[in-house]
Amino acid sequence: MKFGKTPDAVGRYRLSTAAEEDLIGIALFGDEHFGIAQSNRYRDQLERRFTMLADQPLLYPAVDHLREGYRRSVCGVHSIFYRIDGNDVKIIRVLKNQELEKQL
C-alpha cells in the first residue's frame, strides 16, 4: 500500500518505505498477540486516519521540535508522523509511542 485515496478526498497519502515496514510490523504483532480480526480492525483504523490526514492535513500539530516539517497524529498506541507535500500527505513513520526517541 503506497497510495491511498477515497472518492471524495481532496488529497491523497503516500507511505514512505519506513512507514510500510512499520505497518508490516504492526500487522505481524497484532495478528500474533490480538488475533487476526482485531489486528485487521486496528489496521483499518490506521488507514482511516491516513485518509483523514490527506483530507485535513493541518488538523494535527507540527512537531518541529522532533523533526522540522513533521506533524503528529496519535492513533491508538501509535503516533503517525507525516509531512504535507503539496496537496498530498507523506506518512513518514507509524511508531509506538515508547519508540519515538529511538526511531526519530
Language-model regions, residue ranges each:
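Arg/Lys-rich, positively charged N-terminal/basic patches that mediate binding to nucleic acids
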Residues: 1-41
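Enriched for short, Lys/Arg-rich terminal
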Residues: 78-104
